[in-house]
Amino acid sequence: MDTPLTAVETRVLGALIEKEMTTPEYYPLSLNALTNACNQSSNREPVVDYDEATVISAVESMRKRSLVRAVQQSGSRVTKYRHLASETLGLTEHQAALMCVLTLRGPQTLAELKTRATRLIDFESLDDVETAMNQLMARESPPLVTRLERRPGQKEARYAHLLAGEVADDAPEPAMGRTASSSSADRIGQLEQGLDDLRKEVADLRSQLESFRKQFE
């Protein structure tokens, strides 16, 4: 892209793509619903606390760049918003899902991307994820994804989106001399984190449903 997106714009775009894929019955999103989607605690790294003024400012900027469109649905006075990422950036549905996960959760390995994109769209294998990522990296106008250099102690390379410009690899250095028991503890920790994410996601969905209902009261 000619001008990199801001952190807020990146979060807005990711949230819109996510909601289109996971809860199409509530999409497009009102400003309130979009703000809640940006701020939800599940499937977000980092978790943010934007107000509506911050979100609408990002939306207006993205409208000028043909990344977001305002829509007025029949019978409703509430303006809603949908993304135009697939059209403007030329993304397939699978590529859009990967860009969504990258914008919402930062740099990730292929395995992490496959696991986290499952709730958006199905990838049959890790090779399918890698193929889609290679396509995003091979674009000439310009590439949307980069592969970060593998750091000492890491088995897999991580990938990051380039919508906000070049990426600074500031992940903490991995601990050296890891044992089998520490790896097992990590796996248990990841499972526990996954369960916690699911609980938070259910709570966020309930909150969004309540906000949606209030629009008709």
Predicted segments — roles?
Residues 74-77, 82-112, 157-186, 190:
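Short, amphipathic alpha-helical interaction segments positioned at domain boundaries
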Residues 116-119, 148-156, 160-163, 173, ...:
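Helical coiled-coil/dimerization "stalks"
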Residues 23-49, 107-123:
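Short acidic, hydrophobic short linear motifs in intrinsically disordered regions
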Residues 85, 91-133, 142-145, 150-151:
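Extended, charged alpha-helical interaction scaffolds
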